[in-house]
Amino acid sequence: METQQVDAVTFEDVAVDFTQEEWTSLDPVQRNLYRDVMLENYQNLATVGGQMFKPSLISWLEKKVELTVIEQGILQEWEMHLKTKRTALQQDRFWSDMSNGMQLGREHSGGEPGDPVQVGAVFSEDSCPQTHSSTSNTGNTFACNLDGKDFQPLLKETSTEENIVQLNQCVKPLIFTPDVSQKKCTPEKSVECSDCGETFVNQLELQTHSSSHREKNIHKSEECGQASTHPISHGGHVIPTEKKYYECKKCEKFFTHPVYLNIHMQSHTVEKPYDCKECGKAFTERSSLIVHLRQHTREKSYECKECGKTFIQPSRLTEHMRSHTGEKPYQCDQCGNAFASSSYLTTHLRTHTGEKPFECNICGKAFTRSSYLLGHIRTHTGEKPYECKVCGKAFSGRSWLTIHLRKHTGERPYPCTECEKAFTSFAQLTEHIKTHTGEKPFRCKVCARTFRNSSCLKTHFRIHTGIKPYKCNYCGKAFTARSGLTKHVLIHNGEKPYECKECGKAFSTSSGLVEHIRIHTGEKPFECYQCGKALAHSSSLVGHLRTHTGEKPFECNQCDKTFTRSSYLRIHMRTHTGEKPYECKECGKTFPERSCLTKHIRTHTGERPYECKECGKGFISFAQLTVHIKTHSSERPFQCKVCTKSFRNSSSLETHFRIHTGVKPYKCSYCGKAFTARSGLTIHLRNHTGEKSYACQECGKAFSTSSGLIAHIRSHKGEKPFECDHCGKAFASSSYLNVHLKIHTGEKPFQCTVCGKTFTCSSYLPVHMRTHTGEKPFQCIICGKSFLWSSYLRVHMRIHTGEKPYVCQYCGKAFTEHSGLNKHLRKHTGEKPYEYKECGENFTTSADANEHETPHWGENL
């Protein structure tokens, strides 16, 4: 009865085989490394369902049989074992028999199956097995030397537990009978090696011997895919006789044996009837599926008695136990570093050799371990299979999830022995220790700056190369480091998981929270050794030190302006690009800096966190508070050299000085008007856009400037703090008072160059000039009608929108403009403010007074 053949594809693909000559050249350390690598490969394959049976070679290695056994022919037996392509049962029996010694018999005279034949070969432990007087040909069959018939080896079991190789064609049994006492026969050697002249019993021995005559060049046959180091012409076709390489035409993979290739080919067509219902992965055996399912169910049958941790495989438990015992049996001969697992040693050795066998087929990046490659590939696919059940955040690697979970639990298992500070990961601890030692072994070859680790150096080097591999999917902005992208993405999704327990303020990064807490504690741990100034952040100290050295390493490639910090350069670049990535969710206004957005939001919320200790007045920014404090001290240290006017800060002096130079760098893109200060342009642009961000909570009226809103609020309160010294008239705004004062002085400094008309206020002159030019810059986007004033456009727009914000308190009638409401109210109040001087009659509107004038003209005529 034939046994069902089992597909044993993957272990042969990864198994490393040596010739007798090669093996004897290896030292004991290399042989131990061979054992560890073979066991690791098999373990990895078994875990993912790639290996369906355990080869006897692995069983021997797991039992730690002395590797001298392999010297005595095990590797050659393994090679021949692969060539016969036996099933799992046959392989185990074959290896068991071969380890005890075997007698090979052959019978062509009709002997009974199971009877040892007289003509045969007996093998001891140091010999190689022979086959049925056969020579290997290019196919999967073997030819009998006596009758020339082809056969395929097929193993059967007998009641005497003897192994019979049945020849399918010539039906002659080969009987393997354990017989350690017999000695190896020495049949006539009729096959000669063409390279060295040595003779052998058959072609198989010659082939095994020929592998020692390796040469550099490999000659590949295009017809069959084979390749050889020493080709021999046979019928116009290259027949390899030494070390051979067989190529798979589907995936172009090379193999050293035809059996390897045949087994590998089944991986392209092999039937896998056992499907995983979770992920769809298929397996050839049920046992492999069961092992795989543990990855989904997280079934962990092997428990550690020390800590209760469970594992899927017993080998993993064994490795874990060493973390309790401290045992590290695998030591590196190069540097003496010891490891708890052979796989760790194997990976570590690659740091000495530089070997990175696992290469990404997308970007070409190579890794020392397959697990690293798997995690890297997820950066291309975006796959994040490990999800946090607390906050829903997903990760590409299990280790990242483990470290992340410690943020929720507060667990910090890695304490520093120097300062007792603890960390969530060993990598963080390693980096922290260098802050005590000051060790920075990695130096930049361009600017000589040093770093604590190679990854920081690699990230830094991108500043010089300009490479920014991490791109934001929302806005396309690119970053040199992944951490920069991670922080940036939080701007788009608004996520702020780190909250201050003191004031409730939330931050997108843990470092942001740590820096914020120092505001409450007043801690400033970073001190300048030059002047003794203390700062709350290390980055602030770095920037501060450059004020002493004068270093400004960050240069704008547009205007050559230099900056002490990269963040300043990044913000400056937005003046060239016009980029404003920070948008207010209340009014849609955008800003080039996050700090500007933060200040702007306070205009909506009314928050004024910076309070003056002198008068209690609050401000939305620290800069405003600093300027205000100088009003109490009357300090104005910055003086203009032209007119000796003094200012509280250098920026105000710089803006003022443009009055003397005539420089107006801020130009309106709508009408071309230029301004000496950016704030002037910002306010002016609102005339074109109609934007009024500052709304009165009492009546809903909106204003383009905060000062306009403040003045308006005083109209509700009746507050008019600015009083005229000449007539006692009071005003809600200082600007209104300044315009009024010119009535008393008769000053009209703003003159029209066309007609000579003068005006008390500068804003009146450009409006007047439009009467000469005919310019009407404020256009309705709906009907195209243009206006001289933005206020006219605003009132006009209400015709299209139907908005009537001014409502009569008596009858409820609504109007589009305030003047319309005032006229209407006079009907209810009876007020008639317009008097005709000729007859003394009063009217409710100026239009009525003008109409009344017409009859008097007739009387005068």
Swiss-Prot record:
Annotated compartments: Nucleus
Disulphide-bonded residues: none
Domain called KRAB: residue spans: 9-80
GO molecular function per UniProt: DNA binding; zinc ion binding
PROSITE patterns, alphabetized: KRAB, ZINC_FINGER_C2H2_1, ZINC_FINGER_C2H2_2
BP GO terms, sorted: regulation of DNA-templated transcription
Zinc finger feature spans (C2H2-type): 191-213, 246-268, 274-296, 302-324, 330-352, 358-380, 386-408, 414-436, 442-464, 470-492, 498-520, 526-548, 554-576, 582-604, 610-632, 638-660, 666-688, 694-716, 722-744, 750-772, 778-800, 806-828, 834-856
This protein's UniProt keywords: DNA-binding, Metal-binding, Nucleus, Repeat, Zinc, Zinc-finger
Gene3D superfamilies hit by this protein: 6.10.140.140, Classic Zinc Finger
Gene Ontology cellular-component annotations: nucleus
Keyword Metal-binding appears in the UniProt entry: yes
Pfam families linked to this entry: KRAB (PF01352), zf-C2H2 (PF00096)
Function text: May be involved in transcriptional regulation.
Family: Belongs to the krueppel C2H2-type zinc-finger protein family.
The protein's name in its UniProt record: Zinc finger protein 26
Organism of derivation: Mus musculus
Classification lineage: Eukaryota, Metazoa, Chordata, Craniata, Vertebrata
Gene name tied to this protein: Zfp26
